[in-house]
């Protein structure tokens, strides 16, 4: 059984009634693969700290997405940054959150999806996905560096190296 088949098996066998208050609960609000990818990435970025705070932050973001996370990010403009004024999470600053969405917009428009960004740095012959995850994080850190000239500690925490 390859990795994809193994993950699919566990995904189908998982009892979703026990999901809440896990951040993964937010992925199940969407059906479109690109929306699920976006919400999955966002949930993973904000999934640390107090469970209630994680849930509150993700609810605020999901509300901003207005039911279309991928479309929200694809069409995001710097002028939309004020929508994140009230969103802070642990040690992510408001500026970190704004820059995150600027970069997500840039990279999704360049590569078409989160999946494509991941696949660009993933080698199917690798024994596990560690290098793929590492390359994914490096891709975003490099994009932040190219766009903003420096990378805050908050941004580095969003895209850690395994």
Question: PLM features: residue spans?
Answer:
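HhH-family (HhH-GPD) DNA N-glycosylase catalytic core used in base-excision repair
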Residues: 1-162
């Amino acid at each position: 059984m390859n990795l994809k088949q193994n993950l699919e098996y566990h995904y189908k066998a998982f009892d979703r009634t026990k999901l809440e208050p896990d951040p993964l609960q937010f992925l199940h609000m969407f059906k479109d693969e690109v929306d699920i990818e976006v919400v999955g990435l966002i949930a993973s970025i904000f999934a640390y700290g107090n469970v209630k705070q994680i849930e509150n932050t993700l609810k605020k973001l999901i509300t901003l997405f207005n039911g279309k996370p991928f479309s929200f990010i694809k069409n995001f403009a710097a002028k939309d940054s004020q929508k994140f004024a009230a969103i802070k999470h642990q040690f992510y600053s408001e500026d970190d959150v704004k820059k995150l969405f600027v970069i997500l917009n840039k990279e999704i428009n360049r590569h078409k999806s989160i999946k494509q960004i991941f696949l660009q740095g993933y080698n199917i012959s690798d024994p596990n996905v560690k290098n793929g995850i590492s390359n994914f994080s490096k891709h975003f850190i490099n994009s932040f560096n190219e766009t903003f000239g420096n990378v805050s500690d908050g941004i580095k925490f969003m895209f850690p190296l395994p």
